[in-house]
Amino acid sequence: MRRSAAPSQVLGNVAKKPRFIPPGKSNALCPKIETEETDQDVKLKEIGEKHGNASLFSEMFSENQSENFTQSVESSGKVKSTKAWNSTSKCSKLEMKTQSAPKADAMHLPTSGMAKEAAAQEEPDCLTKYFSVMWCKASKKKHKKWEGDAILITKGKSVILKDMEGKDIGRGTGYKSKELDSLEEGQTLMIGGKEIEVMGVISADDFSSGRCFQAGIATHDTVPTALPQTTMKQFCKPIKSACQPSTKENILLNPQSCKPRHNPNDTNSLVMPRPNASHQCMFNKAGLPVVDVVVDPYIANNLRPHQREGIVFLYECVMGMRVSGRFGAILADEMGLGKTLQCISLVWTLLRQGVYGCKPVLKRALIVTPGSLVKNWKKEFQKWLGSERIKVFTVDQDHKVEEFISSPLYSVMIISYEMLLRSLDQIQAIEFNLLICDEGHRLKNSSIKTTTALTNLSCERRIILTGTPIQNDLQEFYALIEFVNPGVLGSLSTYRKIYEEPIVRSREPSATKEEKDLGEKRAAELTRLTGLFILRRTQEVINKFLPPKKENIIFCQPTALQLELYRKLLSSRVISSCLQGRLENSPHLICIGALKKLCNHPCLLFKALKEKCCDPKSDEHVESSLYEGLTDVFPQDYTSDTFSEIDSGKLQVLVKLLAAIRELSSSERVVLVSNYTQTLNVLLETCKCYGYSYTRLDGNTPVSQRQQIVDSFNSKFSPAFIFLLSSKAGGVGLNLVGASHLILYDIDWNPATDIQAMARVWRDGQKCTVHIYRLLTTGTIEEKIYQRQISKQDLSGAVVDLSKTSEHIHFSVEELRNLFTLHENSSCVTHDLLECDCMGNKDHQNPSSKKPSVSRCCQLRQDQGKHNSKKPLSMSQLMQWKHFSGQHQALPDPFLERIKENVSFIFQNVTNATSPTQ
């Protein structure tokens, strides 16, 4: 505190210096008045010492309180009260008493219980308040040059100043709490080297949710009360020709001639919502007649309710009706809900119709998809619209972008992400009115070439389609939103400060109650904002249209060779060093890969072992030391080419399961999925060995042939019994309803990979009961990976985490110790974790004891409630499934009955048990 502001220093009377009093306003024009005020304060202190009662000060202080004062700021940053200048002496007296009396009270009262109690009553409650302010650098200029808006937070005697990006730009302490509590609009305050002026009060709810930082972001324009009437032009003679062109002038003169393309009053018609007055004021300045936009009945009659809702949602987004000035949308429906059909309906409608004067909204549309889905999109256009209504151009090796430019016949271009980068210069020269990105979650990294290229396109109307929206990685979530609606959430730094950091901090175990509350409110506000242009529905909306689905988690007993090799690997020096925390160069990932190969088949491990022995110059020293001594465990005559199913527990189960399907349902077919090409080679040899006809699609399959392979397999005349599928190459977007059995041979760290692969068969067009089998080796790393999957998501697959987990995961030493443990004495570690006492004889499903939470579209998956159970919520849902031990006398499922000798445990869940099937 600066003594230079004391009254005695201001008066220059150093010889007769009174006891120090906290500074008040000094006025060089009124020295006599200030001297009187100082003497008055000394008298007040003497009275206080004599009576020892704080109430006397309160009475004397309250008598001189003024009702008419305004706030001003001294250069020291203290708030002061300035009386309206009716009287100079009154002003000075009131001002000095207002500021110095409470301090004198605190300094000179005796420390009696009554005094302490009175002081406690006068102590402020330290309530936190929020204000919207303007700020600038401190100066003595009369006309300030304000540099920007900010948020002022006051609590007790301290203040924090945040800019509109959430960054702290100023802090201060030592202010008078009563003066901070009385801040009002128009008052000023010094904070550090900055001067602020209060603009208004912000509610605590607006600050907690982050709405106060959204200045101008995602707000709707004010709706005018009435639209101005269009000035009609002077009458002119009509054109004699019967074919009068529909120019803007003719439409204005004869608005009755502009009618909807289809009848909006039909019973099953799908009519788009009309724009409100604000939208018309912005986009219909010419005053064209507003016409109903009706989806072609040729399509509308085949749409399901959720698809009709999706088309309306997309229409409102791309027309700018949901968020002012933004024309993007994210359709995040689960796989199989018809995202392709909804987009085709939207494109066809906007290519032929428009809400203002019947003028079509689109001239050209660009659809970017993975290479394996280019022909599938073209096929869907032909399926729903035929080849006469619309011409679709697909870019491939034989059809270049130049042909699309030179031909007026095509209004829709379909191109793969890879081909887009090759033809980027030609694409940028074309004016597209709508951009659709299928499997758009690959755009979650804003720095990759594909995202940069698409962002640079001039098209404002953008739609992302993804069946697996990102939920946990908020920066990737921001990248998708920024692509479709740039700037709707502000800059990346603003997003991090306002949303990401509070939300992530609230999920940490050490988070305080305030941090958790703030994180929940920020997450709710982020959900509200993004809900304006993100729509997500789960597969539950079409379950009633699909046949029953039986999902089986099968735990396969490992063979003696697998157990011996597994023990040998776990005792290696590499794994021991991992468990001691030596994780340089990620040796634990090599160990995990070796254990996964062993679970699939020992021959895969043997092949890797031989490759390292034949290549001593290899820099994979860690892998070579991991395989040390494994050769002695394999039989002497063992080779990777002469493998047998007797060496792998999962392969034994697979062989028996395929035989049971062939015998019991000879007309049904199987999709066999693996994450690895080497494993697919083993499965292919197994098919050859048992004479099963097959077809295969993996990363080596040419993109131009993939759709033909899928169509051939789906045909009822297909001779193939098994479809060998690589989940990494073709597990996304393919429709394999020609099969009713799907076997997932191995497991991936990323649950989305497995869920997408399993969704290939249970979707629209499927007529038979669907059987899904997930094979896991009991007690091994595969069971641990499965537990890790279901601890992050619901078993129904409603929402998945698409953060790039893969195998580049950070593990703690404790997690690695759990992964590198072989449980030989348990029939199912997962069932043991459930603490279920059914003894593997639970042949019924329990109804959910908890009401399922209703979640909004693309809701951030924060924990909605707290539970004391150590089991994750999704893990506990396994209690609702059927539990079967391998020792079960008679399994109700005939396919499972054939394989139970090689199985230790089974979880089964049946969906749509009452649906009619063939």
From Swiss-Prot:
Lineage top rank: taxon: Eukaryota
This protein's GO CC annotations: nucleus
SMART domains, sorted: DEXDc, HELICc
Domain Helicase C-terminal span(s) in chain numbering: 653-817
Subcellular location: Nucleus
Signal peptide region: none
Catalytic activity, EC: 3.6.4.-
Sequence positions that bind ATP: D333, E334, M335, G336, L337, G338, K339, T340
Region (Disordered): 1-29, 842-873
Keywords noted in UniProt: ATP-binding, DNA damage, DNA repair, DNA-binding, Helicase, Hydrolase, Nucleotide-binding, Nucleus
Chief site of localization: nucleus
Pfam families found in the cross-reference section: Helicase_C (PF00271), SNF2-rel_dom (PF00176)
Composition bias type Polar residues, residue spans: 1-11
Function statement: Involved in DNA repair and mitotic recombination.
Family assignment from sequence similarity: Belongs to the SNF2/RAD54 helicase family.
Protein known as: DNA repair and recombination protein RAD54B
Species: Gallus gallus
Biological classification of the source: Eukaryota, Metazoa, Chordata, Craniata, Vertebrata
Gene symbol of the encoding locus: RAD54B
